[in-house]
Structure formats: structure tokens, C-alpha cells
Curated annotation (Swiss-Prot):
Signal peptide, first to last residue: none
Protein's recorded name: OTU domain-containing protein 3
Catalytic activity reported: Thiol-dependent hydrolysis of ester, thioester, amide, peptide and isopeptide bonds formed by the C-terminal Gly of ubiquitin (a 76-residue protein attached to proteins as an intracellular targeting signal)
Gene behind this protein: Otud3
Main location, first listed in the record: cytoplasm
EC annotation from Swiss-Prot or TrEMBL: 3.4.19.12
Record PTM: Glucose and fatty acids stimulate CREBBP-dependent acetylation, promoting its nuclear translocation.
Length: 396
């Protein structure tokens, strides 16, 4: 038996060979990445470095980071493999599977091949390692694996290439840089070789809406009845606090104050106070004349009859004559403006601030009521990342 045959027959030799191939592939990837960085075009001096820093800052704001892959022509399949499996060692397999899918679905992809290149030549070239792959390969990969691919670009909205219309679809996030290179996108603290599980806020909104509808169906909640009860309760509280019995007036004030009960009560009290002041102003001149006339007559009669009547009666009428100016002064003060313009503006500012706080509180309650199911495991929550909601869809 030769040495080669003996080596093949030894137990565990296949595992060592696979490990050696894996290490060789990793070394080749590192060398290719270093070479790509050295040979990367640098228009305008440090333009590429600035682009990388800007891209990193953009992703960091979303809680994400770049995981670079070698720019050896296999970068797209390396980045997709890192997202799908946690590493990029199977990029050749992903490339071949993508090409095979394009051949099977030729009628979908042939119209998008350049006119002067036959489809057979295009897929034959794409199947070779190191051939740059474009959007048609991303669409084929997404459809073949029944998932969505989200592409990040610097200072641009996200592109979502949908491989399926099913809900709760897995997403692979990659970055397109320098106009020719793809990298993998990971959570900012993810340094593992586990598959990436990123989910955009766009998809979370659809899931939350579906979950909320399902909850409402199961609980039998009638939204209209609930809103009607809330309005009636608010009207009752405002009416009890202000003494107002005009239902329409209360509802108008509630609507004007965005159903802020405290603000509506304040507004109604101000309206009632203004109405009362107007009534006092309309009736007060006549009342003052009436008060002044009898007071003077009583004072005069008190002086005229002081000799004929007892001293006590004179004192009583004199005291009444003295009391009427005090009452007149009190009534006059009650009609003076209670607050200055500055105080009124400050009061309006505080009321506006209260209304804004109430609106924020209502929004917070809505968000809390529409939160995700508490039954979702903590591991699943750790794999969620909230991203921007701006999307453009690329469909072939």
C-alpha cells in the first residue's frame, strides 16, 4: 500500500484535509483583502478613506457596522454568505447555485442581459470565480433562497430586493461601496461567525399591525364603542368641573384642545368668565347710579333728620353712606384686568406646553399598546435592528 493510500485509509484524515482547505481559503481571502486595499483607487487623495469613515458613521447611527470581505471579484457572494451562514467560505457554492437558478428561470433574466452578449455566455462568465456579479445575481439569490436582500449605500435610501412576498421574511443586509464592492453589514457588537439576523423597521411595522389586528379580533374589541365611551367620559368630567350643560360647547372645546380635559376646562372657565364680565359691564353703570342715588339721599336725609331723630339712627345712615363708596371701589376693582399681557402670554405658553405634553403622552400610550408580543424570546429581540423606513424596491 502506498503512502497516499495509507493516508486516505487513516481515520480522521478527511477532517484534517477539510480543515487545511479552510485555513488555506482564509489565508487567500486575507491576502486578497490586503491586496485590494493596497490597489484600491484613491481619487482626490484620501477620498476612499473619507468614504469609508462616513459609511461607518452612517451605519453606527443605526447600531450597525461593516464586516469587510476581500475585493477579489467574489465579494457579493462572500457578503451574502456571511449574512446567510456566518462566514464567506462557501462563496463558490453560492455563486454556482445562483447561476443554476438563473438558467432555470431564463425567461425572467434573459431580457436584462446586455444586447450584445448572449445569455449562455453571460451565465457561463458569471459561473467563473472572480467574475463581478450585479443586480441580476442578487435577485436570483434572493428568489432562490426565498428571502429579501437589503442594500446599504452612503447617503442614499435603502434598496430592498424582494425574493418573496411572504410575511416575516428573513433579510440579508449588505453594503455597496466605491461603486464596485460589496461588504457584509452586522450589528455593531457582533463579532461572531453566526448567521446575521437583521430586520428593518419597515417589516416590523407590518408585523405589529398584523399582531394588533389579531389581538383586537380575539378580544372582540369594538374600537368605535371605546372611542365613544372616552368622549362621553371626557364631556362628563368637563361639565362637572365647569358647571357647563351645553354638550356641543363642551365637545367643541375638547376638539379644539385635542381632547385634553384640563385644557378644555380652562378654556371653558375663561369663556364663562368673559361672559360674566361682559354682563357686569352692561349692567354696572345703572347699578352704580342707583347705588349712588340712594346713598346720597340717605346721607342727606340723615343730616336733615338728625335733629328730629335719635343719634343712633343718624349714625346708622352715616355708616351706610360711608359703606357705599367701598362697595363701589370693590366692584370697580373686580372689572380691572386680572393679568397683564405678559402674564397672559406666559399662561398661553404654559397651556400650549401642557397640550403638547398630553399629545406626547397619548402617543406613548398608543405605542405601548401596540408593542410587540411579550412572548417573543429575548434572543429574537437581540437579533432585531431598527433601520430607516425609506425604501426603494428593485424587481426583475
Amino acid at each position: 500500500m502506498s503512502r497516499k493510500q495509507a493516508a486516505k485509509s487513516r481515520p480522521g484524515s478527511g477532517g484534517r484535509r477539510a480543515e487545511a482547505e479552510r485555513k488555506r481559503d482564509e489565508r487567500a481571502a486575507r491576502r486578497a483583502l490586503a491586496k485590494e486595499r493596497r490597489n484600491r483607487p484613491d481619487p482626490g487623495g484620501s477620498g476612499c478613506e473619507e468614504e469609508f469613515v462616513s459609511f461607518a458613521n452612517q451605519l453606527q447611527a443605526l447600531g450597525l457596522k461593516l464586516r469587510e470581505v476581500p475585493g477579489d471579484g467574489n465579494c457579493l457572494f462572500r457578503a451574502l454568505g456571511d449574512q446567510l451562514e456566518g462566514h464567506s467560505r462557501n462563496h463558490l457554492k453560492h455563486r454556482q447555485e445562483t447561476v443554476d437558478y438563473m438558467i432555470r428561470q431564463r425567461e425572467d433574466f434573459e431580457p436584462f442581459v446586455e444586447d450584445d452578449i448572449p445569455f449562455e455566455k453571460h451565465v457561463a462568465s458569471l459561473s467563473k470565480p472572480g467574475t463581478f456579479a450585479g443586480n441580476d445575481a442578487i435577485v436570483a439569490f434572493a428568489r432562490n433562497h426565498q428571502l429579501n436582500v437589503v442594500i446599504h449605500q452612503l447617503n442614499a435610501p435603502l434598496w430592498q430586493i424582494r425574493g418573496t412576498d411572504k410575511g416575516s421574511t428573513r433579510e440579508l443586509h449588505i453594503a455597496y461601496r466605491y461603486g464596485e464592492h460589496y461588504d457584509s453589514v452586522r450589528r455593531i457588537n457582533d463579532n461572531s461567525e453566526a448567521p446575521a439576523h437583521l430586520l428593518t423597521d419597515f417589516q416590523m411595522l407590518h408585523q405589529d399591525g398584523a399582531n394588533k389586528k389579531e389581538k383586537m379580533k380575539t378580544k372582540g374589541v369594538d374600537v368605535k364603542d371605546g372611542l365613544r365611551d372616552d368622549v362621553e367620559d371626557a364631556v362628563h368630567k368637563v361639565g362637572s368641573a365647569t358647571g357647563c350643560t351645553d354638550f356641543n360647547l363642551i365637545v367643541q372645546n375638547l376638539e379644539a384642545e385635542n381632547y385634553n380635559i384640563k385644557s378644555a376646562i380652562t378654556a371653558l372657565l375663561q369663556v364663562n368668565q368673559g361672559t360674566g364680565n361682559d354682563a357686569e359691564e352692561n349692567h354696572e353703570p345703572g347699578d352704580r347710579v342707583k347705588q349712588r342715588g340712594p346713598s346720597r339721599e340717605e346721607a342727606g336725609s340723615g343730616r336733615r333728620l338728625s335733629g328730629n331723630q335719635g343719634r343712633n339712627e343718624g349714625r346708622m345712615e352715616t355708616s351706610e353712606a360711608r359703606a357705599s363708596p367701598a362697595e363701589e371701589s370693590k366692584a370697580h376693582k373686580s372689572q380691572l384686568p386680572k393679568v397683564t399681557n405678559k402674564q397672559r402670554r406666559e399662561q398661553q405658553r404654559l397651556e400650549k406646553k401642557k397640550r403638547q405634553e398630553e399629545r406626547h403622552r397619548l402617543k406613548a400610550l398608543e405605542n405601548r399598546n401596540g408593542s410587540r408580543d411579550t412572548g417573543r424570546s429575548e434572543a429574537d429581540m437581540n437579533t432585531q435592528v431598527t433601520l430607516v423606513k425609506t425604501f426603494a424596491a428593485l424587481n426583475i
